[in-house]
């Protein structure tokens, strides 16, 4: 009979996993900030070209790297089932999938410059944005393989190596950007393309560093991934893709809906778009907290799922959602009491300032729903239920949130408030449906036992 986990023990385990993951998320966001700051010192044209390139690269990168999240619940399940011999096989096959997906993503990014005229990107930006996409695309195989190894390390309960590498990447990116963007010695001035090359090189360096650490560190020796290689196992590859593709699409649906607000509002003027982007930037930073908790929940739930310890699994879920509630209340309080100070970091323009201040009230309103829905999604991934959540996110965000937000913003003349009401509606529906699905899955498992 499986031993039931204690409340304090499980809370400690969640925080042990969550905090390094949270630091990793902030460090990765810092990489984008460094690119923006250094590109801004080149020229406004270079900065705009990189912004366009990142806008196209980011969805592709998130889609393909999110597919590799499947490694996490599979490794956690094998750990919980006490079958460590299965773990290296899972990771090796995940790396085969990662290489294949990385090459596909790289080819997509090489072709993307041809879409720039179709997307209405100004001719003045097309050459530099195209070169940026060509350059950064070479890093995609490293991105997907790194995601697979990261999932393996975190699922074993070792998130700190990834955190340290992410923090080191912040330090390394500055000189890399300087060398390739501004030129030094034999390296010519490459401008925005140099930013893409620097990021791609950094991604390969991060992969090599993590792989080297996993190869050498004692903690991984019992499940040594690199002891030998093996051929592609189509059965396991299909299982990885069956689990991972819905995760990737769900992440894509969620991320893309939040990036459409600026497009919907663009005909209504720069001031509204700027205010909307400020509010969106604030919520994106705050979202890293429940997202990091959700990754920790996937690991702990996945372990108990493999162990078939349903009582402890439900305890983790309840504890995770309670923790998500606590953090949501904290972020709501932060927004309520510090709105003026937060907006002042972004702008001093009076018109933009007032609208952003108003929009942060909508951001505050959905913190709880957002925390619950991402927490429930993390639990479901741990239970290897990914197809249902994919359809839920598609319906909630693109069948409901997008049309409702567009109608309220443009037809009902509500402007950015309409977009945010649409997002709140979609998030609320996703939250309710994901929690219902989690309850249903738990009820089924309870009946089976």
Curated annotation (Swiss-Prot):
Q: Which InterPro entries match?
A: MATE_fam, MATE_MdtK, MdtK-like
Q: Which GO terms describe its biological process?
A: monoatomic ion transport
Record field: transmembrane: 17-39, 54-76, 97-119, 129-151, 164-186, 196-215, 243-265, 280-302, 315-337, 352-369, 390-412, 417-439
What is the top-level taxon of the source organism?
A: Bacteria
- One GO cellular component from the entry? plasma membrane
One GO MF term, please? antiporter activity
Q: Cellular location of this protein?
A: Cell inner membrane
- Keyword DNA damage among record annotations: no
Membrane-topology descriptor: Multi-pass membrane protein
Q: Which UniProt keywords apply?
A: Antiport, Cell inner membrane, Cell membrane, Ion transport, Membrane, Transmembrane, Transmembrane helix, Transport
Protein's job: Multidrug efflux pump.
By sequence similarity, the record places it as follows: Belongs to the multi antimicrobial extrusion (MATE) (TC 2.A.66.1) family.
Q: What is this protein called?
A: Probable multidrug resistance protein NorM
Source organism: Acinetobacter baylyi (strain ATCC 33305 / BD413 / ADP1)
Which taxonomic lineage is given here? Answer: Bacteria, Pseudomonadati, Pseudomonadota, Gammaproteobacteria, Moraxellales
């Amino acid at each position: 009979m499986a031993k039931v986990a204690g409340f304090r023990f499980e809370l400690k385990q969640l925080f042990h996993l969550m905090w390094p993951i949270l630091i990793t998320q902030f460090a990765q966001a810092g990489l984008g900030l460094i690119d923006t700051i250094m590109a801004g010192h080149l020229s406004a044209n270079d900065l705009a070209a990189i912004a366009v390139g990142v806008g196209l690269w980011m969805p592709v990168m998130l889609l393909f790297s999110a597919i590799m999240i499947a490694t996490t619940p599979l490794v956690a399940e094998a750990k919980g089932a006490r079958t460590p011999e299965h773990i290296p096989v899972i990771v090796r096959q995940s790396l085969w999938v990662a290489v294949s997906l990385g090459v596909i993503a790289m080819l997509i990014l090489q072709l993307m410059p041809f879409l720039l005229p179709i997307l209405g990107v100004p001719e003045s930006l097309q050459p530099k944005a195209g070169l940026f996409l060509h350059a950064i695309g070479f890093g995609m195989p490293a991105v997907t393989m790194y995601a697979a190894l990261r999932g393996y390390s975190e699922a074993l309960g070792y998130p700190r190596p990834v955190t340290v590498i992410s923090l080191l990447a912040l330090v390394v990116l500055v000189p890399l950007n300087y060398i390739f963007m501004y030129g030094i010695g034999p390296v010519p001035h490459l401008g925005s393309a140099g930013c893409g090359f620097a990021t791609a090189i950094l991604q390969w360096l991060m992969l090599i560093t993590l792989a080297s650490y996993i190869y050498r560190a004692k903690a991984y020796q019992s499940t040594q991934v690199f002891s030998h290689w093996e051929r592609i196992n189509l059965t396991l590859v299909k299982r990885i893709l069956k689990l991972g593709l819905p995760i990737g699409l769900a992440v894509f649906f969620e991320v893309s809906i939040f990036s459409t607000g600026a497009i919907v509002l663009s005909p209504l003027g720069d001031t509204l778009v700027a205010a909307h982007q400020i509010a969106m930037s604030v919520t994106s930073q705050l979202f890293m907290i429940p997202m990091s908790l959700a990754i920790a929940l996937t690991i702990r739930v996945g372990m108990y799922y493999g162990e078939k310890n349903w009582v402890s699994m439900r305890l983790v879920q309840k504890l995770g959602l309670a923790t998500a509630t606590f953090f949501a209340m904290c972020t709501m309080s932060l927004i309520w009491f510090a709105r003026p100070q937060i907006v002042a970091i972004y702008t001093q323009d009076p018109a933009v300032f007032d609208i952003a201040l108003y929009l942060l009230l909508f951001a505050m309103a959905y913190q709880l729903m957002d925390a619950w829905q991402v927490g429930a999604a993390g639990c479901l991934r741990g239970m290897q239920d990914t197809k249902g959540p994919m359809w839920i996110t598609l319906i909630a965000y693109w069948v409901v949130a997008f049309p409702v937000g567009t109608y309220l913003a443009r037809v009902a003349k509500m402007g950015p408030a309409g977009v945010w009401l649409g997002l709140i509606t979609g998030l609320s529906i996703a939250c309710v449906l994901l929690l219902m699905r989690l309850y249903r899955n738990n009820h089924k498992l309870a009946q089976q036992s």
